[in-house]
Amino acid sequence: YKRQDNKEGCKMIWRSQIVLAEGLLDFYLHEVSKYCMFQMFCGNWEKSPKYDSFLVPMSKVEEAVSVASSNEWFFEYLNHRFSRDVFLSVESMRDQLNLIGIGFIPVMVKAFPRDKEEISKKDGTKIVEELFRRRNEIAHQNDRSHETAVQTDITRDFVGVYINNIECIVNAVDERIEEKDLNI
């Protein structure tokens, strides 16, 4: 970097890439949630325990019965139901992946393979926690620590690892969906 402005400009772009990447992951999880829920709804996939206890208001049931030939109500309802949800924290991602029948632990095992499943689960959970924590610090606190208010440094390499971790999660979700589609 020849000038300090360029270095700081790069860091702002890298921070933006982090927030964008997490936003894309959240959008992806919303979209695959609709697909997976529909597969269970149609009987193409085994229903998850969380699917069986998924609450739907009677007004939506009435709408579904009145337009039995259309599935539009189903996607409209899921869009509305999930519209305020963010699936990026460990808890919300775990709940959502379990709801849609592909499971948090199997996704973490595929995304972050280690010698033992327990280590994959632990490492995957830690990675998802770190992804969400850093994204929130950037998006809501200008990448500053709660404790010190000092801005956390960021590098191009960090962003590469960060985005690679997101890609590993997405690829693992895709693989789990493909396995379900093929009844593997």
Task: Place the predicted regions along the sequence by residue.
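Conserved small/polar residues in nucleotide/adenosyl-binding loops
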Residues: 1
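Helix-loop junctions and short alpha-helical segments
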Residues: 20-21, 28-121, 128
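Alpha-helical context
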Residues: 4-16, 73, 107, 114, ...
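Conserved aromatic-histidine-acidic binding/catalytic patches
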Residues: 5, 9-21, 25, 119, ...
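Short, hydrophobic, well-ordered secondary-structure elements
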Residues: 10-37, 163, 167
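Polyanionic, low-complexity intrinsically disordered segments
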Residues: 110-184
